[in-house]
């Protein structure tokens, strides 16, 4: 039974707010500056305590949507030190969100130290892809020794959409799922399993996104480094944080603002 649902949005940019729906007739909205994800989690907890629950003792577990599980995880897991170590290792491949996921775990550990925490990885759903879908056409050693491959992301979203669509249509065959937001991806799903997806080794690949470039000629970063005297870290920051809609519009990441 769903007691409440909601979101914290536009974190780190103007117009941030926290909203929560207790039922269809009641929606609470709080406009508040959310400078980072830790502040957002605190506001969510405050809103829950002011509404559907009266004490933190009512919270049995907290689920975390994690970004990258590498090849370690193909399902949700209870968080322990081993899981955290592997998540930190895989999280290094997520320049935009890697640390943010861990901030959430740290915040809950501090605020609710006795509550069980569970990690659900965005990449887990795509572990069903076959080699012809996840291998890149580069020397095979790059995968076998360094695990460079297509991982895919937004798996929790694509999995949920596929399951709900199958229920609604009474059909579990082939679907194309589109996740469209600040980050965006498309996934081909067959019989409830991911068979191909637009994101790749990192969430930078695929479609144009809020601040990410999406697919570009792979020589472009090398050309920029050679001709503009930029380091690899500087080019990475540009492609992850200064490109996409932000780069094309010189400053806007939200399509609602661009429209």
PLM regions with names:
Residues 35-39, 78, 82, 99-103, ...:
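Conserved active-site and cofactor/substrate-binding residues in soluble primary-metabolism enzymes
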Residues 227-259:
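A mobile "lid/hinge" subdomain adjacent to the ATP/sugar-phosphate binding pocket shared
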């Amino acid at each position: 039974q769903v007691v409440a649902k909601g979101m914290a949005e536009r974190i780190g940019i103007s117009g941030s707010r926290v909203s929560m729906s207790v039922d269809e007739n009641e929606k609470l909205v709080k406009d508040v500056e959310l400078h980072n994800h830790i502040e957002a989690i605190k506001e969510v907890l405050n809103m829950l305590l002011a509404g559907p629950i009266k004490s933190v003792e009512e919270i049995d577990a907290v689920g975390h949507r994690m970004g990258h599980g590498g090849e370690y995880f193909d399902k949700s897991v209870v968080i322990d030190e081993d899981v955290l170590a592997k998540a930190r290792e895989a999280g290094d491949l997520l320049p935009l969100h890697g640390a943010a996921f861990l901030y959430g775990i740290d915040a809950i550990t501090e605020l609710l130290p006795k509550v069980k925490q569970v990690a659900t990885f965005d990449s887990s759903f795509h572990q069903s892809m076959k080699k012809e879908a996840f291998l890149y056409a580069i020397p095979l050693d790059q995968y076998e020794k360094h695990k460079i491959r297509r991982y895919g992301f937004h798996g929790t979203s694509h999995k949920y959409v596929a399951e709900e669509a199958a229920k609604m249509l009474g059909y579990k065959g082939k679907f194309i799922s589109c996740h469209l937001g600040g980050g965006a991806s498309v996934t081909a799903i067959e019989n409830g399993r991911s068979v191909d997806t637009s994101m790749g080794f990192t969430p930078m690949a695929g479609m144009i996104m809020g601040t990410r470039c999406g697919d570009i000629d792979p020589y472009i970063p090398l050309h920029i480094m050679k001709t503009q005297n930029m380091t690899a870290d500087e080019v990475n920051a540009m492609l992850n944080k200064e490109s996409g809609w932000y780069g094309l519009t010189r400053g806007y990441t939200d399509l609602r603002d661009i429209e």
